[in-house]
Amino acid sequence: KENKRIVTEKNMGPLIKTQMTRCIHCTRCVRFATEIAGVPELGAIGRGEDMQITTYLEQSMQSELSANVVDLCPVGALTSKPYVFEARPWELKKTETIDVMDAVGSNIRVDTYDWEVKRVLPIINENINEEWISDKTRYACDGLLQQRLDTPFIKYNKKFEKASWNEVYKIIKSKFEHTQKEKICGFVGDLTNMETSFIFKEFLERTIGTKKYDFRPTKSFINNSKRENYLFNSTINGIEEADLILLIGTNPRFEAT
């Protein structure tokens, strides 16, 4: 009678859950870590049926793209730890959108169950993110459920108190009515997508009658009189064909994700 092959689970950090008995040693995850993520922390030890995929020192993968191995694994040996037992795929509503967590604009699919975002997956776009997304893009949705402001607050006597949406809308309307339009300006945050920014711009121009709006954080300035000041001289896909890239005071690995 043949012995049953059992492999102990590996510790790959808070994002990747392992069930290594399922592993068929295809080494997709190993090749991704080395060739795509540029972090050769995954590898195979042992020979034959004793071969195991591991991080060598039993530690978390130190990569901003580590969770992509979940999508690559063909047998479910590597799965998403935060998503475990959350929902079944056929129960989820799938919405295609664009990531706003960084300036890359990765194409993503948001899977929701009722009003909760359960997971974020990449959509293939060879010109931008190919088929990968960063861990921040994939797991930032965790913050949408916990420690999130979902009720408006109004400041009374230097203290914030809960209020209804109708109360807030009435106060906003009153402020607009009693303020000269020349003194009204609008700002959008760093995580606002293009569609929302456009609607905000249309609201200010058509409803309020002002063209004073901006998106830049404090102490930043962009002279938009010339297109080259805010448009890169190459597409993301074209970077691979560049003869020379000069970076000054920046590290795209950490700052672009």
Map each language-model feature to its residues.
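Catalytic alpha/large subunits of respiratory electron-transfer oxidoreductases
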Residues: 19-20, 25-26, 30-31, 37, ...
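Ferredoxin-type iron-sulfur electron-transfer modules in oxidoreductases and energy-metabolism complexes
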Residues: 1-21, 36-70, 81-86, 114
